[in-house]
């Protein structure tokens, strides 16, 4: 199975927030920061260090649309959360392969395995993505994203 040079979790931090949990990710550009956001969401539910991409690994293509950047970010996270919640696939690698800023659409490939509680260290369940305090900041050399999720 080809890996398509899928990105791996590296740029993130958990920030305390009174309501739930806020994720902060960053990257050299918005695409990398978005990939990191999907990965940190998965990492919060299952420690990605405990996930091995073996012969059982599967790749899924996720396509989402929005009406602005915030709704696009929401849709991306919500779709990956839906796959985890319904198919129990934990994604260890994510790569955005198409990012249309004018039409607010993203196509991403996620590579992961089915959750196995005997092998994987589980974290906290995420119930929903929220728009609360959602922030996307783009600068020439770095992009940052903040998202609060309901746990």
UniProtKB/Swiss-Prot annotation:
Q: List, in alphabetical order, the GO biological process terms annotated in this UniProt record.
A: tRNA splicing, via endonucleolytic cleavage and ligation
SUPFAM superfamilies per UniProt: MTH1598-like
The entry marks the following residues as binding Ca(2+), namely 20, 150-151
Molecular function in Gene Ontology: metal ion binding
Q: Which Pfam families match?
A: Archease
Any coiled-coil ranges, and where? none
Q: What UniProt keywords apply to this chain's record, in alphabetical order?
A: Calcium, Metal-binding, tRNA processing
Matches recorded under Gene3D superfamilies: Archease domain
Q: Could you name the domain of life of the organism this protein comes from?
A: Eukaryota
Fetch the InterPro entries from UniProt.
Archease, Archease_dom, Archease_dom_sf
Sorted alphabetically, the Gene Ontology cellular component annotations on this record are: tRNA-splicing ligase complex
Please report which protein family the annotation says this sequence is part of: Belongs to the archease family.
In terms of PANTHER family, this protein maps to: ARCHEASE (PTHR12682), PROTEIN ARCHEASE (PTHR12682:SF11)
Task performed by this protein: Component of the tRNA-splicing ligase complex required to facilitate the enzymatic turnover of catalytic subunit RtcB.
Recorded protein name is Protein archease-like
Q: What is the lineage of its organism?
A: Eukaryota, Amoebozoa, Evosea, Eumycetozoa, Dictyostelia
